[in-house]
């Protein structure tokens, strides 16, 4: 590509040696304005019909948006009809302003006011393109000609609003602001401000769009800080952002521009919009949320937001989309899973109000997601992830050494199959390998213990097992049922076995609850685990020993 690179030139920087935005932080939410129904809609392959628009409109109200751009009513009958529906039947709350877009053309402005008749404090958003490129190639006008278009529109709009009895709000956008020389953008905006004469009770929105993202986010922030310093009547202005995402940094540009002094953001849910999209307001809002700032829009049911978005836009959200994608709260990596597992346990024990879990910048429950899919198992997964799934989904608290042992078994399966293993498959494999053992040679049946009169402090264990289906009676000595039973089994099999580690826990609550026992057994050649589940904890332990013995026999027979 080196030869093609000569076609392009670097974007000019802004000379602000005393810029202040790099030392600031976002401490409050901006005014949010959704443009899903206008900018988002015009970018769709199949634009929304009335039902899809209405569902999106009501979702935006539910989420708490106070300013919603509902369309371009002078451009199509569909948008005009929807604007009238919003005004007459949309049940718009008193604190929500409908916003409509209009070009700086008299006949379109007239039609726009017809669409808004009866609306409560609507926003008339008028614009014209001011960039050097469009002045030269599209309009063939100089700066004065472009400025006059904006000034004439501002006069007509304010006059019509006065004749209609007032109650209107105004917004002006120098479209393609990022392609406009700053002094030109300032001259045109100040001319509009002079006409509109904003007041503390009716501030003018000056919207400075990154219609095409052309530079790094810091440059946009510099442009916004420069404009905020130089705009006339700044105290009676609301400086608004409208970033696009052509370079993939729309969110970063918006965040830095808020630091630079902007008050308001126009964007869409999940960033739908022309070309690579508008700024994603859900991601922006949740970025603030994870920094302890209330975003003032409700993202607590992100699955519902996703559902309406996908229905209304007929677009699917990617699996890795921040905060909402199917896989964003999921870890496959073994080291990540282990850290998450330990972090979740530490959080439960500490009961600390601050969320601190490795690899999870947000508590999934805060956006209506669950912990169930945080850890999923494939060939990259480790013992911590497998242990987490068994504990969270099935209440099994595997000892660490058993986690290591079972992970090797799961690793073999995922290496062969080359795909993710669902939670139930992992659980079924554990039960089959360590508890039920359908191919196991031995089965525990029953046992009795009584004092050993010849050896003080010891007990004799008399047990029944089956060996390939035949009842066998075995007997051993030890300081308790577990010790005595493994002694009996060792003599019966002719294999010296001993218990290295033992743990147990209940699986449910109540006096008749089942319990699971984990027994690590050593034998000449290694160590292996077994597990048993029974309402009698001693029986569960003896079943676990039989399970371990079956696995020892498999090893010696070359089956494992």
Curated annotation (Swiss-Prot):
InterPro entries (alphabetical): 2-isopropylmalate_synth_dimer, AIPM/Hcit_synth_CS, Aldolase_TIM, IPM_Synthase, LeuA-like_post-cat, LeuA_allosteric_dom_sf, LeuA_N_DRE-TIM, PYR_CT
Subunit structure: Homodimer.
Family: Belongs to the alpha-IPM synthase/homocitrate synthase family. LeuA type 2 subfamily.
Region (Regulatory domain): 437-560
Domain Pyruvate carboxyltransferase: 30-303
MF annotations from Gene Ontology: 2-isopropylmalate synthase activity; acetyl-CoA C-acetyltransferase activity; magnesium ion binding
Name this protein carries in UniProt: 2-isopropylmalate synthase
SMART domains: LeuA_dimer
Protein function: Catalyzes the condensation of the acetyl group of acetyl-CoA with 3-methyl-2-oxobutanoate (2-ketoisovalerate) to form 3-carboxy-3-hydroxy-4-methylpentanoate (2-isopropylmalate).
Cofactors required: Mg(2+)
Organism of origin: Rhizobium johnstonii (strain DSM 114642 / LMG 32736 / 3841)
Any one Gene Ontology BP term: L-leucine biosynthetic process
UniProt cross-references to SUPFAM superfamilies, sorted A to Z: 2-isopropylmalate synthase LeuA, allosteric (dimerisation) domain (SSF110921), Aldolase (SSF51569), post-HMGL domain-like (SSF89000)
């Amino acid at each position: 590509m080196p030869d093609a690179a000569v076609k392009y030139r670097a974007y000019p920087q802004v000379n602000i040696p005393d810029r202040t935005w790099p030392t600031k932080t976002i401490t409050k939410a901006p005014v949010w304005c959704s443009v899903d129904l206008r900018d988002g809609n015009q970018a769709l392959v199949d634009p929304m019909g009335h039902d899809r628009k209405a569902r999106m409109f009501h979702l935006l109200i539910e989420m708490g948006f106070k300013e919603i751009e509902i369309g371009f009513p002078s451009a199509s009958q569909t948008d005009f009809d929807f604007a009238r529906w919003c005004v007459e039947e949309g049940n718009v709350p008193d604190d929500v302003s409908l916003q409509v877009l209009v070009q700086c053309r008299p006949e379109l402005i007239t039609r726009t006011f017809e669409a808004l008749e009866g609306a409560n404090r609507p926003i008339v958003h008028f614009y014209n393109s001011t960039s050097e490129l469009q002045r030269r190639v599209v309009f063939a006008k100089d700066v004065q000609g472009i400025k006059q278009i904006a000034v004439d529109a501002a006069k007509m709009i304010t006059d019509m609003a006065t004749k209609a009895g007032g109650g209107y709000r105004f917004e002006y956008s120098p479209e393609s602001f990022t392609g406009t020389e700053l002094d030109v953008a300032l001259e045109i905006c100040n001319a509009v401000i002079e006409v509109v004469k904003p007041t503390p009770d009716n501030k003018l929105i000056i919207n400075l769009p990154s219609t095409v993202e052309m530079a790094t986010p810091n440059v946009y922030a510099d442009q916004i800080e420069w404009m905020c310093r130089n705009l006339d009547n700044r105290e009676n202005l609301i400086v608004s952002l409208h970033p696009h995402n052509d370079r993939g940094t729309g969110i970063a540009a918006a965040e830095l521009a808020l630091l630079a002094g902007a008050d308001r953001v126009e964007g869409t849910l999940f960033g739908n919009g022309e070309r690579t999209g508008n700024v994603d307001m859900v991601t922006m809002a949740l970025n603030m949320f994870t920094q302890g700032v209330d975003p003032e829009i409700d993202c607590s049911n992100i699955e519902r937001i996703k559902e309406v978005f996908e229905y209304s836009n007929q677009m699917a959200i990617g699996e890795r989309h921040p905060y909402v994608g199917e896989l964003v709260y999921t870890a496959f990596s073994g080291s990540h899973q282990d850290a998450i597992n330990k972090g979740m346990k530490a959080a439960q024990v500490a009961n600390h109000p601050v969320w601190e879990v490795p690899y999870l910048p947000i508590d999934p429950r805060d956006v209506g997601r669950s912990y169930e899919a945080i850890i999923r198992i494939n060939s990259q997964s480790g013992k911590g992830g497998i242990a987490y799934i068994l504990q969270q989904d099935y209440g099994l608290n595997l000892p660490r050494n058993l986690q290591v042992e079972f992970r090797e078994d799961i690793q073999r399966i995922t290496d062969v199959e080359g795909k993710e293993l669902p939670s139930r498959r992992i659980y079924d494999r554990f039960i089959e390998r360590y508890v039920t053992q359908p191919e196991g040679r031995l089965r525990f049946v029953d046992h009795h213990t009584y004092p050993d009169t010849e050896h003080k402090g010891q007990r004799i264990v008399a047990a029944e097992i089956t060996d390939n289906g035949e009842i066998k009676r075995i007997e051993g000595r030890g300081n308790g049922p577990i010790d005595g039973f493994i002694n009996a089994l060792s003599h019966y099999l002719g294999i010296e076995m001993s218990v290295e580690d033992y743990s147990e826990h209940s699986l449910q609550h109540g006096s008749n609850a089942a319990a699971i026992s984990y027994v690590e057994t050593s034998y000449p050649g290694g160590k292996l685990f077994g597990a048993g589940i029974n309402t009698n904890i001693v029986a569960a332990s003896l079943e676990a020993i039989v399970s371990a013995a079956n696995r020892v026999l498999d090893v010696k027979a070359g089956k494992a």
